[in-house]
Amino acid sequence: MKLKTKEDIGAPIEYVFGAVSDFETFQRQALRRGAEVARLDTLDQPGVGVAWDIAFGFRGKRRQVQIELIEYEPPTRMLFDSRMTGMTGQLAVELMALSKTRTRLILELELVPENLSARLLVQSLKLARGAIDKRAQVRVADWAKGVEDRYTKMV
């Protein structure tokens, strides 16, 4: 199953990449939403090898996922690999400079089930695809608006 969303942001690509690679902020957001997040690496800067172990509730079950940054190409691309029981996934984060002060963010998530229960989970996600796409688009748009606002205040 593949999900894709894109959003244009009124800020330079370097600024947007800094925001999208601010992993500590994303960790705090996950913690506020009830997830348990443990950083597995000892790196003090973003880069290949940054990894997390995340536990969260989803569809009535406790899920655990390990995520690792496997490609890091500032300021244009990051690729994350994820593994959970019965499923693997990849999240690609790509940035494209549209102008000096405008950047396009493209997020692509691919989930690959490896057993029957994971297939059933992915199938249920496919059935709710419209709602999931809409929710993802709203979240990304809200995040992008926040980045734009912070950039505008800074300039």
Predicted regions and their residues:
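A short, structured loop/turn motif at beta-sheet edges
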Residues: 13, 45, 70-75, 94-104
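Hydrophobic-ligand-binding modules of eukaryotic lipid transfer/binding families
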Residues: 1-8, 102, 137, 141, ...
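Generic structural detector for well-ordered beta-strands
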Residues: 4-10, 55, 68, 94
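Hydrophobic ligand-binding cavity/cleft-lining segments
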Residues: 1-45
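Short, surface-exposed coil-to-beta transition loops
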Residues: 2-4, 62-67, 87-92
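Glycine-rich portal/gate segments that line the openings of hydrophobic small-molecule binding cavities
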Residues: 38-85, 138-155
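Beta-strand/loop substructures that line and gate deep hydrophobic ligand-binding cavities in soluble
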Residues: 81-134
